[in-house]
Amino acid sequence: MKTKKTISIKTAQKKLTLCAVLFIFSLNALIFGESFGFKLVKKRKYGQSTQVQLYEHQKSGAQVVWFKNDDTNRAFSISFRTRAYDDVGLPHIFEHACLAGSHKYPSSNLFFQMMKQTYNTYMNASTAKLFTYYPCSSLSEEQLFANLDVYMNGIYDPIVLTEENDLKREAVRFVLNSPEEEISATGAVYNELLGIFADKASVNYYYSQKFLFPESCQSYITGGVPADIRNVTWQSVKDFHKKYYKPSNSVIFLYGKIDINRFLEYFDHDFFSKYEKESVDFTDTYIPWEGYREAVYEFPVSKETNTDNASIISYMFTIPGVTADNINDFRVINHYLSQESSWFSQTLKEKFPLAKFYFDCETILLYPYCVFQFDNVNEEDKDQLMAILKEGINRLCTEKIDKRYIEVFANGLKMSTILDEENPNPIDELSLAGLFWASGNDPLYFIDRYNSLMRLPKSSTPESILATARKFLLSPAQSGVFITKPVAGLAEKKAEEEKKYFADKKASMSKEEINRLIEENKAFDKWLSDNEKINLLDKVKVIGKDNLPEEASDVTITDKTEDSKRYLLGENRGAQYVSAEFRFDLHSLPSELLHPVMLYFSLLENLETSNLSLEELELFQTSSVYSSSFSTQFMSIPSQYESGGTVFDAVAGFTCLNEKLSDSFAYLEEVLLNTELKDFDAIRSYAGRIAKSRRQGLSGNPINILIELSFVGAHPSYTSRFYATRLDYWDFLDRVSTMPDEEIRELVEKIESAKKILINKNNLTFCCIADKKQMSKCLKAEKAISSKFSAEKVTKHEIFPAKKPFPKSIAVIVPGNSWYNCKTISLEKLGKKFNAKYKVLASVLSEDYLFPTLRYKYGAYHAEASISKESFYVFSYRDPAVKNTYDVFNNSSASFEKIDVTDEKLEGYLSKIYSYFAGGESLTSQLENKIYSHLIDDVEDNRDLRMMKELKSVSPQDKEEFSKLIKILENEGTIITVGGADQIYANKNMFDLIITDFIK
């Protein structure tokens, strides 16, 4: 259960930076409510440890909200309410373009240089339906101040208003280098959206908005549609900035331990004093329609894609007038419907075994709505699904929900508050605050929403939930069914249409126009080259090598063996909660039992037990534990990378409040020892759903496939594990989903025999993080439970069936028109042990060669080099090309040798990497990481301190050594590409293996 985050306190005394006279003057001004043109309007308490202060600039109307606390991870964000009135993506395009330089900082590359070469913990920008926001954070107030100056100048005085090339680079441009070539389009935003539109779930969301709210601001895609992005004009970008980027249409959010007067004076003097209050027209001509509608959107996939049970059917309806208390009621309804025991889930399991269902309310929008969504179904299932839905809604509107479904929120909210206070995330805080402001007009609305959520256990009742259901679900004025249907072969058809578009565009051009476009491309390339020579980093880099703290805390874990059981115990002093895990080594099983056990641990918590019905079990779970997990997990052993060494465990664990400890152990025992495998339909249904969700989940996030395969590509000994836990396992699940009862019965027998081997105290590692008092209770509970386990002798097996190692070049086909390319190699093949200084040199390769070449010149959204003890690899993200990218990769060593690697350059990259270590972790996180290192036999005391020292040791003399490593990667690395079928098949000679399992 997730909730609004609260803020943690790091106690420290506030540093004074003004002289005494100015300080007294400013303090008095604040007491009386005014300072540097700002008036202190409100003070409010927020969460456990933050006071929120709202300031308004009297001349310009700008507002500043300060999250006043002692957190030293300080943050800034400025938000503007923005709207889209078409699908060109102007809000998104300007977000990119304004960070491509200002007249004070006339460098199109500076922002990206700052991201990687200053002492920051976060820098980015983002566009949503209602607003655009620009957040950054740093452990240094000085660095934060310098970084936000770049943001503010880029926002209010962007160079894109006078330099069109920034727009061409960041949005889109047409490429033609000779009269014989075909025209193409590229650009960061354009290629980013090509990648996003490859994800069926994202496309379903975007086009369902168009369906429910046609031609409203909410219907338009603020990020842009690739075909429409091509129509952007320079003048439209200028007009967009003039309309929306005004102080009176903004809120600045500040967070943490800062000198507020310094910031207020800066905002007033450098910006807001130059502006008057202005209103912004947010008129939306949309007129809500009434009645019921249906529509189908055809999602393009390649011809070999299996489209059976791959559609999304959404029943959507508006909820005008919804209140905060109604939203809480909907949260309870959502929780209730998501339970496997709910009437919805049980009926779907019977009628549509592969279907995945969820209910959601989108309320932070101009036009709030609810959706009942069914995944993994077919278009022709619509009528039957709507009949089930109608019956389910009638039940919600006639039967009161058990009050225990409300009571569970008290447990979850308390636990979430504790965890979020331990691990504050200022960027999340500020972005959410901006979103809530943009949905109304109150910059402190986020506090009201937070307080409303915390009231849920008292404000929501069975009666109020029934009333909310009746008010909004029974007869909505505006409703409909939207279907997203994948169509095999449509991707190829769309690709041909794209080729025709560019061919027709060229055919329509005169010879003079063609030559002009060629010259424009030459001029653009020259501009890119000239721009790379501009280096303004010294103007904004504040923290240098000598200022970086060389200190890091460490923790100790008790690692002992008693009664044949291994214990990994971490004392979490003063903790209000406990985390505990029973881990069973899967190497105790013969390989033929691996997949049955993997399925079994996925089934746990979703089947009734010998003592409890499924509904009773779910209520037991939500009223006792905060979170629970029954799964199988594998971890690579660093000292055994070349032999495929793996820790592979079946895990039963939970996190709970101290006062819920006894109930949580009782729950774990009930699930682990008493689950019954009698519901064959449920087993079939789960197997099918898991297979679908795993394939679709990875194919919808191709970068995750690339990352996993980059490790396997570097260490081919893990090929067998990849097949066993991915491709072969999914095929096994597919078979289970259609097994007759007799075969399911045989499968259950295998699972029961495997349990007798696996759940064995000689095969157990017990992990626990708790305070001292709770730890003794945990150990007592563990002994009581494990006394019921088998104590037979355990024999270790080779768990993964042998597979031929992956070849040196692999491609994976997923839907879409975007590619993710990688070249990878192990450190063993490089003949080196990992040293943290290599991370700094990899950043030089990334930011001085790969990123500017592949993003600025060729339009890939991102490119990077990365090195760790696992591997050394280069990769591209949302890339429009395949072969050209590998040409760039293979020129890395030659290009790296040309880079002037100075102490000054290294210091910039060092400071960014260093911030990851200097930020610190909560005690819980440190203990979790230390337990993990014990599990994989990679224990090292003061690891962070050692890496800090290695980072600081980097010098220009290391360039030659690292250049040799790059050369080995070029010559011996494994290549991996994930993406659409057309370029993979067009370059099929590059690949020894093409995997299509992700589009089954």
Describe each region flagged by the PLM.
Residues 1-12:
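N-terminal secretory signal peptides that target proteins for export/translocation
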Residues 180, 186, 235-270, 726, ...:
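Non-catalytic, conformational "gating/processing" segments within enzyme and secreted inhibitor domains
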Residues 175-247, 253-256, 260-271, 275-302, ...:
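Hydrophobic, small-residue-rich alpha-helical packing segments that form membrane-like cores
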Residues 71-83, 91, 109-157, 163-175, ...:
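M16 family metallopeptidases and their MPP-like homologs
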Residues 29-33, 37:
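Boundary at the C-terminal end of the N-terminal hydrophobic targeting segment
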